[in-house]
Swiss-Prot record:
Gene Ontology cellular-component terms listed: cytoplasm
Keyword Cell division set for record: yes
UniProt similarity note: Belongs to the EPSP synthase family. MurA subfamily.
Subcellular compartments: Cytoplasm
TM regions (residue ranges): none
Top-level taxon of origin: Bacteria
HAMAP family: MurA
An example molecular function term from Gene Ontology annotations: UDP-N-acetylglucosamine 1-carboxyvinyltransferase activity
Organism whose genome encodes this protein: Photobacterium profundum (strain SS9)
Function: Cell wall formation. Adds enolpyruvyl to UDP-N-acetylglucosamine.
Annotated metabolic or biological route of this protein: Cell wall biogenesis; peptidoglycan biosynthesis
Top-level class of the enzyme under EC nomenclature: transferase
Identification of the protein by name: UDP-N-acetylglucosamine 1-carboxyvinyltransferase
Residues the record lists as binding UDP-N-acetyl-alpha-D-glucosamine: 92, 121-125, 161-164, 306, 328
């Protein structure tokens, strides 16, 4: 049963929306809970397919896991150390089980992963990091196997390239290593900071998260604790762009403006009126002209690659020409041909996309979601296009946006989920 969204083009999107917890923080935190010998409560976990898959995976490993508002985890009974292919194939994040398993139990194996089709994301950086902490890694029959006699050993690790995933793996595993670990050229994303906050809540000694040098003083064991997942900055940005391109006015609650500085600066440059408080952001585009902006994606605190597709849509319907340069992932313009089907004028040249004035606006069409963030831009495009748009393969959206049609409906979008 393939589900699709049917969207009728309409007016401005306006109102209030409550932002969910960040998938990209919730996932590493759920996997890191394998390190805890006592019960853990994690609040503000979004309801998403990848989260469900992770909970099922942890359950298979022997974790007692329940959801009742928060997610409650008891990893004291872990008795299985292999993350099997049938679960891993749908989700790359499963590699995050490896570090905690080998750090706490001296062994772990994870099937080589699946997930979105964006470029080459090798697990080499994860493997290399664990090897530097003293683990022995082998690749056998499609599985990455890690083992260590006794405890992992602290190490000074200089990352070959900035990687959020590998930073999480090394940081998590190092919490139970003997001695001190220093990670240089570490990723600085807010989700890394949130994972470190969780680790510290259960007794780890992590400092420097959010900078390019993270220090982890190993401890013998980790207990239990409580943590609330940080707000999703990408979901926030997606709703802000929806207001900008539709000429609307939206207030995002339960969010963190400080994590979105690069995005907010570009929205202001594009002509939006932005206001912020401690945990809210408002955008007003009523009677204002949208102007195209140039963007170059970069690791945090630069402009996030996960907002690139939404801003290509903004540029396509704005006045003037905007150039977007993608420096993080290859093959990340798969939404552009779909937008061209709706009448957009854009040219892809290598890792840049040049978005020109789309005279006469967009027209509804049948389009296909190709990856998580790109698919959100197609939904927004449908709401500002003339006529009806069908977005196919929306399982990509369900992997990363909680109840997106409900939230958009409340803002005035004419959207429904249909099964065919």
């Amino acid at each position: 049963m393939m589900q699709k969204f049917r969207i009728q083009g309409g007016g401005p999107l306006s109102g209030e929306v409550s932002i969910s917890g960040a998938k990209n923080a919730a996932l590493p935190i759920l996997f890191a809970s394998l390190l805890a010998e006592k019960p853990v409560e994690i609040a503000n976990v979004p309801k998403l397919r990848d989260i469900d898959t992770t909970m099922e995976l942890l359950g298979r490993l022997g974790v007692n896991i329940t959801r009742n508002g928060s997610v409650f985890i008891d990893a004291s009974g872990v008795n299985e150390f292999c993350a099997p292919y049938d679960l891993v194939k749908t989700m790359r994040a499963s590699i995050w089980a490896l570090g905690p398993l080998v750090a706490r139990f001296g062994q772990g194996q994870v099937s080589l992963p699946g997930g979105c089709a964006i470029g080459a994301r090798p697990v080499d950086l994860h493997i290399h990091g664990l090897e530097q902490l003293g683990a022995t890694i082998t690749l056998e029959e499609g599985y990455v196997k890690a083992s260590v006699d006794g405890r992992l050993k602290g190490a000074h690790i200089v990352m070959d390239k900035v990687s959020v995933g590998a930073t999480v793996t090394i940081m998590s595993a190092a919490t139970l290593a003997e001695g001190t670990t220093v990670i240089e050229n570490a990723a600085r994303e807010p989700e890394i900071v949130d994972t470190a906050d969780f680790l510290n809540a259960i007794g780890a000694k992590v400092t420097g998260a959010g900078t390019d040098t993270i220090t982890i003083e190993g401890v013998e064991r980790l207990g239990g604790g409580y943590h609330e997942v940080v707000a999703d900055r990408i979901e926030t940005g997606t709703f802000l762009v929806a207001a900008a391109v539709s000429g609307g006015k939206i207030l995002c609650r339960n969010t963190r403006p400080a994590l979105l500085e690069a995005v907010l600066a570009k929205l202001e440059e594009a002509g939006a009126a932005i206001e912020t408080g401690d945990d809210w952001i408002s955008i007003d585009m009523t009677d204002r002209e949208l102007k195209a902006v140039n963007i170059r994606t970069a690791p945090h605190p630069g402009f996030p690659t996960d907002m690139q597709a939404q801003f290509s849509l903004l540029n396509l319907v704005a006045k003037g020409t905007g150039i977007i340069t993608e420096t993080i992932f290859e093959n990340r313009f798969m939404h552009i041909p779909e937008l061209i089907r709706m009448g957009a004028r854009a040219e892809i040249e290598g890792n840049t996309v040049i978005c020109g004035d789309t005279d006469g606006g967009l027209s509804g069409a049948q389009v296909m979601a190709t990856d998580l963030r790109a698919s959100a831009s197609l939904v927004i495009a449908g709401s500002i296009a003339e006529g009806e748009t069908i977005v196919d393969r929306i399982y990509h959206i369900d992997r990363g946006y909680e109840y997106i049609e409900g939230k958009f409906s409340a803002l005035g979008m004419n959207i429904e989920r249909i099964s065919e």
